Every structure is written in C-alpha cells, then in structure tokens.
Amino acid sequence: MAVRERAAAAMAALERRVPSLDDFAGQSWSSWVERADLPAADGAELEESSKNTKKLDAMTLIKEDMSIFGHCPAHDDFYLVVCNHCSQVVKPQAFQKHCERRHGPLSKLYGRAPPPPPAPASSQKCHVVNGQGPACRAPGSTKTSSREKGQGSRSRGHQPPEKTQKDNLCQPGGLTKDSPGKPPMAPPSKEPPGRENIEIIPSEGSSHWAEGSPPEKEPSGTRLPPKTHRKMARKECDLNRQCGVINPETKKICTRLLTCKIHSVHQRREVQGRAKDFDVLVAELKANSRKGESPKEKSPGRKEQVLERPSQELPSSVQVVAAVAAPSSTFSVRAKQTYPYCALPRSRASSESELDDEGPCGGDGDPGLFPFPMPRGGTQASSEESEEEGTSDDLHPPPDCHYATRPPRPQAFCTFGSRLVSPGCYVFSRRLDRFCSALSSMLERHLSTHMWKKIPPAAEPPAHLVNSPLSAPLSPSSTGTCPRLPGPTLRPACPASMPPTKDNLVPSYPAGSPSVAAACSQAECMGGSQAITSPLPANTPSPSFSKLPPSKASKSSKGKDGVEVEAPSRKRKLSPGPTTLKRTCILEPTGKGKPSGCRGLSAKTKTALSMGLNGTMGPRVKRAGPLDCRGSPHQLPTPVKASQLENRGAAGHPAKALPTNCLSEEEVAKKRKNLATYCRPVKAKHCQAGAPADVACSVRRKKPGPALAFEEKCSTLKSKAH
C-alpha cells in the first residue's frame, strides 16, 4: 500500500503544472515556491526519505552529474529504464551513453533490429522507481519527454515478467503485470502519442532488440522500424551521391558518400543504377564540397532535423516534468543555453535530459570546441557519423538563436609603438630601416655597374668593302692584344683600359665588351707622331659586361686555339697583297658622341697615308715584322700620358709596343686581383700567339664610313704633325 500511495503522490505531482525557472530569473526562490504551491505531502515524504538516507547535502551531486541524475537523488522523483542487452537499470537521460559505451555504436545496434508488427502498447507501461519510492505514469495524463517515454516503454516492455514484478512495473489502473501473455492494450486514441514517441528513437539510435526476447517485446517496438525503414530506403536510393556497395555480411547498401574509404574504387564503379559515370559524379561531389554545399556537411543537420521534429510535434498534453525534479530540469535548460552552437530550436516542453543528451552535435560530440556554429549545416560532427547517416537534399530550417559565421575579430589592438614590417613581424626601432637602406643602396650600386648602357647599334659594313672575314684567334690569356696590320708597320696601342690620369687617356672598356671590342685605340695615327687621345674619360662605365669572368673566358677560348691552328696557313694563301682590304685601328674624336671604330682602307689610301715607324713621312715603307701589343700577363697597369707619346714620336725614337696591360675597370677597382682581360672583337677570331709574321688578323669594321671622311681626318692629322 505504501508503494501505491507514493505512486499516487507522484502522479499528483506530475499532474500539477510546475512553473519554469526562466520566468523567475533574478527573483528569489520563495517566489517560485509560492507559484509552484508545493503541498505539505511532499515535505512529509522528504522527511521520511531523510530517515533512510544520509544527510541530504551529502547526497547532492556535482554539477556534471546533475543533468543525468538530478540535483539530489535522495528525494528527486526520477524514472529508470532497463537495457535489453545487459538488463541494467539506467536513467533515460543516460541510456544513450550507456548503449554507446557498453554495446557499441547505436547505428549497429539499430541495424540488427527486425521490423516487428505494430502494436499500441509501448507507451502504457511505466517503470516507476524513486530514490525513496516509485511513481506511475499513464500516457494520457503523464507529462513526460518523448525520449524518456519511448526509451522507458521500449526497454520495460522487453523485460521478462520476473524482472517487471521485481522492478515494480505498474499499469495506469494500478494492476500489476502478472504474465507475459497479457500485454496491456491502449485505446486507439492513445496511438498518435506513441507514434510520435517512435520517431525520435531511431534518430537517437536506441532502438535495438535482443533476438531471444519474449514475444511481448515485439509489440513494444510498435512503429519504430517501419518509420526508420522508410527513411533508410529513401537514403539508399540516392546512388548518385552515395557509395552503394552492398555489404556481404549485413546485405545492406553502404550509405556513405561516393568518396567512401571503406570500399575500393573498383567496387564503387561496379554499382549499377547511377545516373552518370562514377568519375563524373565524384568530380561533381568534390566541386560542390568546395562551394560549401557538401552533402557530407548536410548529413549532421539531417540528423538534427529528425531529432527535433518529433519533439516539436508533441501535443501539449504530452509534456514533462515531475514536481520535485523541476529545479533540475530548469537548471540544465539554462546550462544548455549557455552554448550558442545550438543551431536548431528546442522545445520548451522537453526535459533537461533531452536537451543534454540530444545535442545538435550528436551525443558525445565535442560541445565546447566550436562555440559558433557553421552556417547552413556546418555543424561539426565526426566523419563516421556523417558517413553513416548518408546524404540528404533537405535544407535546414533557419535557426532561432543568433550565431556568427566566423569567430569575432577585434576592431583594434595595441601595437605598443611598433610598426608592421611584414605579416607577423613588428619592429620597435629605426635601426633596421637604416640597415636596409644601406644594404639596398649597395645592391643598387653593385647592380648598376653591370647594367648595359645604351649605345647606338653598329651597322654592318658594305658588301664591297668586306673581304672574307678571315681572322686568327687571339690568345685570351694575354693581358692585351691588338690586331696586327700588314703593310706599313704602325705603332699600335692596346685597347686596354688605363687608369684615369689628369690628362685625357685612352677610353677604358672592360674585357669582353662586344660593342666596342673592335674599336682598338691607336696611340699614334698614320699622319704623324702626335698621339691621339680620346676626350672620353677613362672611367666610362662598361657598355656591356661579359657574363664570364676573365679567367673563365680565357679557359674557354684556349680550348678553341687547338681547333683553329690551321687558320694562318689558309690566310697566307688568301691574302693577295695590295688588293687585300687593309684595316687600321684608329680613334675618332668622340666629342660629338661618336664611338671609336675601326676604319678599313683600300690599297691606294693605305699607300698615301703610310708612315714610318719613327713618325716621319715616307713614300712607301716596307712591311716590317708584326708587332704584338702583348705585355706580360700579370703586369701592373702603367699610365701613359699623351705628352709622353708626343715626345717619343717627335724625338724619332723607334716605336715600341706599349707596355700597358689591358685591365678592366672592375679589376682596377679591386686593385689586388690579377685576372687578365682581353679585347674580344665582334664576330672575329683571335690571333694565335705563335702565328707567322705575315699573317694578318682582319678585324670586322664596327661602323661603316665613307673613305673620304677618313682621308680628311688623316690629312688634318698630318698637317698638325708638320
């Protein structure tokens, strides 16, 4: 009788409408107690329960367990369900976690469930166990959450009769269940609530039955499997997005995406019934996933939608909460609302247990890692859950709560007087600026020395003046070489770059300058002994710079010497004396910006303008031995002034080769590097060191010019010499 009295008291408490704590936010507890109007009978029960238990404050649970077991299990009214697999009595709030921890994933447990015939008896039984005494629930009058009712009724219906009597199972009429052959039947009006209870169970994955259970267990499953079976069939039909490979063990179709990692590509390609080729569908799926429309992301939302729909459709009569358990329910509701990632609306009619265990992140997901939800189904769920659930084209309903699409960013932040130099690099002083400016100026100056200067392009010589371009290779190892001229012997000056002096010196060009390689400077011209010097300063920057260093260039050119050994003997036969085009290297006045070049002379002009070695005029001087303008390979550059050249020519001393070396400006600047440079003519071969005396090295003329202009200049030089 005591059990029935306690059950009647609990039912009376359930029938009362307990006000929500949200309505009393900021007010005292006394106002809530007055509104709740708790009877004195509850207080008597509390006193009675305190006799059989320890202190009430010692029985109060910690905050983490309050959502599962309530605030104080010593006097809270709560309900238990029995697991079909291990026959363990657990609370409905912790039933899902119990199944996942003890019996594996819920999807596998649900996959083994056969579709039993419907029977409207699931919501009739209530497993009433109290901390101090049990309470009874009827489907029509009891206010309970859909999850508690579905789970409790299902597991209780599967229990053997011995277990049910032991656990105080009761019916609304107060009649205990005596035999398994008498399942309680409900009137037809009670079927819709039972039907709605069943919708949420498959989504929670808690519908699982033991294969050896008594026959009364099958009616308790009522409409669960048909509902979910239709949903599974709808998912299996979409082969354009899902794997579709049939599992040989379970005989079920894989509902993962086309990019399933479980089955091989060959197995997925063999699936029949796809609208397009497998590769095309995979490419489309990946393209959609890049745009943020991946069905894999939508599948968790589909699960949430299925979870929420039944709780929203519940009629107002099927609502929750025991009178004494109301504080725990409202507490967990408010605790749950602190997380703004709940993207879908929650029904106020559902209890705290449903809120805690049916989170949008799916069971034991990581609730606090993503405080801001992803827009439109971007909820974070494990890949296994999303693949198990498959895909769905249904869109998510707009969420009720406010959420942000990205984490918040500060409008401003303190830099502590620093400056942003590069992404993530802040500087607090100007020392780096000075260093960078000095380094950049050094680099710019270094690079500018190697930049090519703009020089007027040289035109090709006329066809009637150009003889066969026969030339012998010049030895690049020599410090300075000059083309040897057949006919009247001249005093050649090497086109070396001389150090700058106070007088105007011969223009300096670094080794390998192709634009001025043929412009070999002459210290004395044919017209007299007066030295001709260019007004061009000696430190003129290089118009072109050889890519190879002089030492490397000399090695490369030395390799060619052996190939062209036979060139002098051929040229000896091909040079017919006076008819051969004679060439002399002269320096034109560059005051007008004209570059120096080599002028070609005919035989007649050569005869008229010939001169002796001592600088005096003569009719026709016999051709003397060739003069080589080579100096010692590693001599220091000796500056030669123009006045010295004049005095030497006027005194009548025999002309000698200038002992100057051809050093580039770069080597002069470095001062201590003994690298030899050479004058490389454009498209001309170098003369060998051991070439015969009568072999002439013809140099291509750099810039064509009329013979008349050359004769006028030479006559002017003659008059000055006299």
Swiss-Prot record:
It comes from the Eukaryota. Residues 106-228, 288-317, 347-403, 531-600 are annotated as: Disordered. Keywords: Phosphoprotein. Residues 181-191 have a biased composition (Pro residues). Residues 230-297 form the SCA7 domain. It holds the Pfam family SCA7. Coiled coil: none annotated. The keyword Metal-binding does not apply. InterPro entries: Ataxin-7-like_regulator, SCA7_dom. The modification Phosphoserine is found at residue 575. PANTHER family: ATAXIN 7 RELATED, ATAXIN-7-LIKE PROTEIN 2. This is Ataxin-7-like protein 2. It comes from Homo sapiens.
